[in-house]
Amino acid sequence: MTLHLGSHVSMNGKKMLLGSSEEAISYGANTFMVYTGAPQNTRRKPIEELNIEAGRAHMKENGIDHIIVHAPYIINIGNSEKPATFKLGVDFLQSEIERTQALGADQIVLHPGAHVGAGVDKGIEKIIEGLNEVLTENDGVQIALETMAGKGSECGRTFEEIARIINGVTHNDRLSVCFDTCHTHDAGYNIVEDFDGVLNEFDKIIGVERIKVLHINDSKNPRGAAKDRHENIGFGHIGFKALHYIVHHPQLQDIPKILETPYVGEDKKNKKPPYKFEIDMIRNGTFHEGLLEKIVAQ
C-alpha cells in the first residue's frame, strides 16, 4: 500500500499546474491539493491557460497520479437569506467542477455552507437544493463535503449533519467526504484518545467508504472549541502521535492525505512552508521538537 501524502500547493503565474507539481515534488510529496484560482474571488484563467499538459506530464514523471481540488470559500450554497449568493455559489461550483475534471482530478473539496443565521435546518435544506442543481448523473467528479469545526453558522460540524445532506441529494453517488482532523477535533470529537471510536461512529452514520480525502492538521485550540485554527503537526492540541496514527490507519490506507498547516516564521513577509519537513516527519514516524526552527532556517 502506498502512503499518499502531500499538501496544499499554489497554482499561479505562467506555470500553473506544472508549478504546482514542481512545488509538491520539492516537498517530497506524491499527491497535492490546489485551488484553481484565488479562493476569495471568482477570477479564473480559462482552462486552456492552466498548463495542464505540461503539469500532467511532470506529475507522471514523478509518480503523482492523484490530485485534489479545493472549491473556493466564497461559495456558500447554505445561504437562504440572499438568493444572489446562493446562485453565485451554484453557478461557480458548476464551473469549478469543469475545471477539476480538466485538471484530471476526481475530487473537489467543498465546505458545505453556512446558514448565516437562518438555522441549521434551513441551511441544510438549501445545501441539498444547491447540490441537486449542480450534480447530474453523468459527471466523473465527486464533491467531497468537508467535516467542519462549527465556527459561526457553519453546517456540517457533526456527522449527522453531513449524513442529512448526503441523504437529501438525488445523485449522492457523486458525494464523498473530506475528513479534516482539526475540524473534527474542534467540533468536539475525541480523535486524540479514541480515533477508532470516532471512525466507527462515522462509519455507522455516513459510511467510512465515503471518505476520499483527509486533511491532516493539528489544532491551536482544545477539543470542542469550534474555532478552526490549524497548527503545525505535533505542535497543537491533537499532537503528533494521534495524527501519525490517523495517517497510517489501516482503514484509510489508500486515501490522499493533505496537509494544510500554517507557514512558519515571525516575519509576516517571509514565512516558510513547513510541508517538506512535516511530510518527512510523518513518513519517518518520529516527532522533532526543533522542527519549527529548522523550517525557518531553510
From Swiss-Prot:
Its cofactor is Zn(2+). It catalyses: Endonucleolytic cleavage to 5'-phosphooligonucleotide end-products. Zn(2+) 1 binds at H70, H111, E146. Its EC number is 3.1.21.2. Zn(2+) 3 binds at H183, D228, H230. CDD domains: AP2Ec. InterPro entries: AP_endonuc_2 (IPR001719), AP_endonuc_F2_Zn_BS (IPR018246), Xyl_isomerase-like_sf (IPR036237), Xyl_isomerase-like_TIM-brl (IPR013022). GO terms for biological process: base-excision repair. Binds 3 Zn(2+) ions. Zn(2+) 2 binds at E146, D180, H215, E260. Pfam families: AP_endonuc_2. Signal peptide: none annotated. SUPFAM superfamilies: Xylose isomerase-like (SSF51658). One of its GO terms (molecular function) is DNA-(apurinic or apyrimidinic site) endonuclease activity. Keywords: DNA damage, DNA repair, Endonuclease, Hydrolase, Metal-binding, Nuclease, Zinc. Belongs to the AP endonuclease 2 family. Endonuclease IV plays a role in DNA repair. It cleaves phosphodiester bonds at apurinic or apyrimidinic (AP) sites, generating a 3'-hydroxyl group and a 5'-terminal sugar phosphate. This is Probable endonuclease 4. It comes from Halalkalibacterium halodurans (strain ATCC BAA-125 / DSM 18197 / FERM 7344 / JCM 9153 / C-125) (Bacillus halodurans).
